[in-house]
Amino acid sequence: MAVKSYQAGVTQYRQSYWQPDYMPLDTDILACFKITPQPGVDREEAAAAVAAESSCGTWTTVWTDLLTDLDYYKGRAYRLEDVPGDDTCYYAFIAYPIDLFEEGSVVNVFTSLVGNVFGFKAVRALRLEDLRFPIAYVKTCGGPPHGIQVERDKLNKYGRPLLGCTIKPKLGLSAKNYGRACYEALRGGLDFTKDDENINSQPFMRWRDRFDFVMEAVQKAEQETGERKGHYLNVTAPTPEEMYKRAEYAKEIRAPIIMHDYLAGGLCANAGLANWCRNNGMLLHIHRAMHAVIDRNPHHGIHFRVLTKILRLSGGDHLHTGTVVGKLEGDRASTLGWIDLLRESFVPEDRSRGIFFDQDWGSMPGGFAVASGGIHVWHMPALVTIFGDDSVLQFGGGTLGHPWGNAAGAHANRVALEACVQARGEGRHLEKEGKDILTAAAAHSPELKIAMETWKEIKFEFETMDKLAIANK
């Protein structure tokens, strides 16, 4: 065996980390980056630099390289592609050996793949567009605490999307008034009400008071309607210890579901809370607050499809995914892509939806896609078409903004939903015939009729900032 000798100095990254003939292994974690290089840095060198700095390379040769097998552990840039319609950047595909990462730790994956490399001077901008997790890695992660089927069985609700509502105003209500708003919405026909992401334990409403009044509302609405109800109690807290304290109290008062802000609260805290929920029979609703800071810039950051995959591995039974038709960012094709990544057991590569790799989830359960943000009854036909049954449609202002109050707003949404589900079963085209379907239902529901009149002119027609670039192999 030849003995390698140490030679100090600086070499080009491409000499070790650009390998266009590499065939990725089934056990590799694959990444697609969008790279905008600095002037004068060629494509292969920039891609190799990203591969090196996100795996085991550094800026100079070090003698300790001889103490390990770099050919095994290094990341490899193996393919480059043009970005359609944008000649300032390109896609770089990088393969990482699975042994670079701690089992079951999406935190460890992120510290390498989206760590210091994102501040690297050789690239002007860098975006992680997609990841392929091999089934060997998926099997080491906890995933959703329960998943879609278990939640439906717990609630005894099948064959339709679930209905929810975020209580407004999001800040400032007392605990008693907050609970009253929940009760009215639940008895009006909703399945869930929800804490907003920034409701924690502020001076105007401490968390324990909110939990008590809300669960009183939930139990009263259940008794009156005969349906299982719930409220997403946000247990996001300043410390993990306080988070678990709130979760334990929610369990004590028999809440069926709690909530966590997984990006603001942190992936480590989220994985721990998901494990707790799994062990304690509690459903876990996930809010994505802070995501747009990370994913909205089309050239730098992390695409939301990656954040969706990370959440599914980390654990959550629900995830906010945008609405397509509401007030929040998200084009239809991309949204359908990450909805599938959240719910399906196998998602094939589909560049028309921005999916760069096949993704096999094995037997890991999926989660409910949550549509929330600027939606009202006129959006119901499109929402049922886009999101399907395994979703939660959350109308905040579209419930509490009803002229006749919360219960009437909830009733209007329930009637609209059931009309759309029935029409779908009859083979009607919901988006083309939506107006006729809702108008016919409103003839027997004054609450829906008033809701349709109230919001008939409300639209959110703004251009999507992060446009889907459809690329071919």
Swiss-Prot record:
The record marks K327 as: Transition state stabilizer. The modification N6-carboxylysine is found at K194. It holds the Pfam family RuBisCO_large. The active site is at K168, H287. One of its GO terms (molecular function) is monooxygenase activity. Mg(2+) binds at K194, D196, E197. InterPro entries: RuBisCO, RuBisCo_large_chain_AS, RuBisCO_lsu_C, RuBisCO_lsu_C_sf, RuBisCO_lsu_fd_N, RuBisCO_lsu_N_sf, RuBisCO_lsuI. Its EC number is 4.1.1.39. Its cofactor is Mg(2+). RuBisCO catalyzes two reactions: the carboxylation of D-ribulose 1,5-bisphosphate, the primary event in carbon dioxide fixation, as well as the oxidative fragmentation of the pentose substrate. Both reactions occur simultaneously and in competition at the same active site. Heterohexadecamer of 8 large chains and 8 small chains. The basic functional RuBisCO is composed of a large chain homodimer in a 'head-to-tail' conformation. In form I RuBisCO this homodimer is arranged in a barrel-like tetramer with the small subunits forming a tetrameric 'cap' on each end of the 'barrel'. This is Ribulose bisphosphate carboxylase large chain 1.
